[in-house]
Amino acid sequence: MQIIFIADFFADEILGGGELNNEVLADSLRRRGHTVVEQKSSHITSEYITEHWDYNFIVGNFVHLPEEIKRSLASFSYIIYEHDHKYLRNRNPAFFSGYVAPPSEIINEEFYKNALGIFCQSDFHYKILHSNLSLDNIKNVAGNAWSDESLEHIAALSSEKKQNGFSILDSNISHKNTLGAARYCESLNAPYEFVSSRNYHDFLKKLAKNDKFVFLPQTPETLSRVAVEARMLGMQVHTNSRVGAASEKWFSLKGVELIEKMRLRREEIVDSIESIFTTGRCSHFTPKRELPKISILTSLYKGDEHIDGFMRNMVRQSVFDDCELIIVDANSPGDEKAV
């Protein structure tokens, strides 16, 4: 199988959760004998897509993907490996009640609709996406991908003695809420350390120094790779309701148990990618969201005389197929009960 993996950035440029996950997926597909070519979204042209007509496409982060390419891909086999909320103008569902945005805030809808599948990372993630887009091609992969090397490194760190205190992700991204996490620790009079490093394994070592991790994001996290890493390291995780990983049953696991769960999950995700490109469909998609009916409540006056004309006018309404008609007995003159 030949695959082109499109993303805004890759792990050699940015040490982000999405980029690390994508790197492991690409390597896992290669180990199974597939050809995987990584291409930055800003470098993709219509000519490039046409020249690679016999390839399948995985689209990761696509902020820099030109609109014409999104339209061109409709003629090809592609999946969207969703890392945040790029179906919203502001990419932050927290701005809207119940995480459901008004139609005017929805973007890229056709791009999502035309994909063979949209891979979400947690139950929390896919429920938000599903409630905003009326699509039936959404799948929850319920996890992330780590290399065997990283999992072995995490396993070794998990057995090391930890000090009493909190680790805090040191991020300059405002919605990661680093300062809010620090204030939380201060409110508990608890010691804390900011954790950062451009070297992934060094970052994990620093993270694992303490027995607790606090993360209080201000926007819904599709999973939060670092929260899962903290659990694999055997740490307590203090968080809020905006972390997708916490919606998964396996989040109650920690240490080696969770490490082995994620090792298996990586292979299951790769299985799903192979399956969807081979068959054109994938199991365990969410059902299409059923939009609520419009309820029309009315009463009748002399219903036995006027019902025919009333119903003729009613069924001619353009949206009547999506309506339910409720007739209330108002005890008006005429044989209402017969009607």
Where do the model's predicted regions map?
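A conserved acidic beta->alpha catalytic loop
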Residues: 329-338
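A short, active-site helix/loop in glycosyltransferases that binds the activated sugar's phosphate group
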Residues: 113-137, 177
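Cell-envelope/extracellular polymer assembly enzymes that use nucleotide-activated donors
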Residues: 292-295, 324
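Nucleotide-sugar-dependent
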Residues: 215-226, 241-242, 246-248
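Short, well-formed alpha-helical segments that are part of the catalytic scaffolds
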Residues: 303-316
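N-terminal pre-catalytic "stem/leader" segment of glycosyltransferase-like enzymes
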Residues: 1-64, 74, 238-266, 274-280
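Conserved catalytic-core segment of nucleotide-activated headgroup transferases in glycan assembly
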Residues: 145-203
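Extended catalytic core of nucleotide-activated donor transferases of GT-like folds
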Residues: 39-116, 124
